[in-house]
């Protein structure tokens, strides 16, 4: 499939490519050895507005379309896929709240993201994999909130996140 890029998209791709090569690439090998990305690189991404790319305009984000968003993170992933996935996972989690939550929940979630925070995505379970129909986790409403009983694996962004989407 051939994509026809607009002038704006071409300029944005070049900008992201140049920034990734100059600012991100020098840290990739050390981040791989250390097993984590330096906090200042995430701050750099926040300064670029990467955390707002797929947040809808009505919630205070850029509201970029999916194609442009994909182009941005594809370009970043060419240098460091893990770095790109850290931001993308936040959008995947937010998208679930926008589609299945209330407008108030979506606004709350977007407000967390706008404060330079990451989200985690907890779907996979030891006996179910990512088969949603086979999940055993439960969330039961109590007087104090919710009681979550879950066993999850592969919680994407689990070590960085301030807000979690947990599938039950």
Task: Indicate residue ranges for each PLM-predicted region.
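Short glycine/proline-enriched turns and hinge-like loops at secondary-structure junctions
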Residues: 64, 131-133, 157-162
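A short core secondary-structure module
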Residues: 149-168
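A structural signal for short hydrophobic beta-strand segments in well-ordered beta-sheet cores
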Residues: 137-140
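Short beta-strand segments that buttress and anchor functional surface loops
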Residues: 122-125, 166-168
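A short, Trp-centered hydrophobic/proline-enriched beta-strand micro-motif
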Residues: 115-123
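Amphipathic, small/basic residue-rich leader segments at the start of a protein or domain
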Residues: 1-87, 107-108
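N-terminal glycine-rich flavin-associated loop
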Residues: 81-103, 129-132
